[in-house]
Swiss-Prot record:
Cofactors required: Mg(2+)
Name of the coding gene: ubiA
GO biological process, one term: ubiquinone biosynthetic process
Any Pfam family: UbiA
Keywords: Cell inner membrane, Cell membrane, Magnesium, Membrane, Transferase, Transmembrane, Transmembrane helix, Ubiquinone biosynthesis
Protein name: 4-hydroxybenzoate octaprenyltransferase
């Protein structure tokens, strides 16, 4: 549906689709995985009634910053992507978009995002600098550490902290439970993603948790998902959430079980489908959160 909506962009200019691919608007899974935990937190921070202004700011901010993250990622990987089957057709790797054009795109996206943050409050504005720093750092970590997914987890969890400061003007200690839960969840699902490229990454020297975990990959991913659910249960208790929230967690748990089963042979395509499937887990938790507040 999302891709159908943006396809008319390809008709605006002969190169328009190249930029759509650069910012991954044709692959919205990253938007969903960043959006759901941000919205969990916005709803919880606002006790179920987020300000419309903040809701619009964070939805648009998620889209813009995810796009910016894709640009900086492709810049960092431009000399590697051509050697990986899944990424060899990316616009920077093929030369359809120049490095200069990519940097201009990145700057525009970050500037637009910052303009949105300026509509919140000083605490949230200060936090936004950390968001840009962590998001920019992640792509380069794949050269130096087997834990780039942890950095990605921090980047994908930063919106949780900003949602609380935007709604409450402060950052309660309990918000860190949601932050840590989302970091662990991100490491889990991005490890599935990394499993699809593991053989290519080994050849070109790119590091990932999928390589680090080795034959214990599925066991460790399942453990991370279990810890994610445990932390969310603790967060639910601290924020006094009810039955609907926990039903959402139960659906997410079922999603995780399906992912473990479907990747039992470690087929790269099955691992990629398991990665995509996490969208439904995040959506289930969000719907459970919304329903819990709505039915009070």
């Amino acid at each position: 549906m999302f891709v159908t909506l943006i396809k008319p962009l390809a008709r605006l200019h002969p190169r328009a689709w190249d930029f759509v691919q650069l910012v991954r608007l044709d692959r919205p899974i990253g938007i969903y995985l960043l959006l759901w935990p941000t919205l969990w937190s916005l709803w919880i921070a606002a006790d179920g009634v987020p300000e419309l202004k903040n809701l619009l700011i964070f939805v648009l901010g998620v889209i813009l910053m995810r796009a910016a993250g894709c640009v900086i990622n492709d810049f960092a990987d431009r000399n590697f992507d051509g050697h990986v089957a899944r990424t060899k057709a990316r616009p920077l790797a093929t030369g359809k978009i120049s490095v200069r054009e990519a940097w201009i795109t990145f700057a525009v996206l970050v500037a637009l995002s910052f303009g949105l943050v300026l509509l919140t409050n000083a605490t949230t504005v200060w936090l936004s600098f950390g968001a840009v720093a962590v998001a920019s750092l992640y792509p380069f970590m794949k050269r130096y550490t087997y834990y780039p997914q942890v950095v990605l987890g921090a980047a994908y969890s930063w919106g949780i902290l900003m949602a609380f400061t935007a709604e409450r003007g402060e950052l309660p200690a309990s918000a860190w439970l949601l932050f840590l839960a989302n970091v662990l969840w991100t490491v889990a699902y991005d490890s599935y993603y990394a499993m699809t490229d593991r053989e290519d990454d080994l050849k070109i020297g790119i590091k990932s948790t999928a390589i680090l975990f080795g034959d214990a990959d599925r066991l460790i991913i399942g453990s991370l998902q279990g810890l994610t659910l445990l932390l969310l249960v603790l967060a639910g208790n601290r924020f006094e959430l009810g039955l609907c929230f926990y039903l959402g967690l139960a659906v997410a748990a079922a999603c995780f079980v399906w992912e473990a089963w479907s990747t039992r042979d470690r087929d790269p395509q099955a691992c990629f489908r398991a990665f995509l499937h996490n969208h439904w887990a995040g959506l289930a938790i969000f719907l459970g959160t919304v329903a819990d507040y709505a039915l009070r």
